[in-house]
Amino acid sequence: MPYLKYTWEFVEYFYKGSPKHIGNKEDIDIVGDEFKTWTTAKWSIAPERNMKKYDHPAMFPEELVERILKLFTYKNDIVYDPFSGAGTTCTICERLDRRYIGTDISEQYCKTAIERIEYEKCLKEAPLWE
């Protein structure tokens, strides 16, 4: 029997206390156009294409994680991902100068996440030219 496949997902945001984020203005790295676009429209983001590369069946696209982190966190904030999988959230946290804690039940996924994070660190430290 034919069926329609969902082509969208919800992102839900929960908070305790006030939704206003308190922090240093210098640690805000979202620009005005990003904020305006991301808060007034549906997002159209291509599915993750590296699931086979990282041997994980359900990865979020890096662009989705980056948008969420830039919207709801500042630089140096701590982000906890209790189902870290192949480490997409932690990798993007490293890229955006957020502190992070990632856990997963799979030892293999944890190893993959560590490799991705280490690679991201190398990219940040490598000079573009000498």
Please give the residue ranges for each predicted region.
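S-adenosyl-L-methionine
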Residues: 114-130
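Core catalytic lobe of class I
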Residues: 1-112, 128
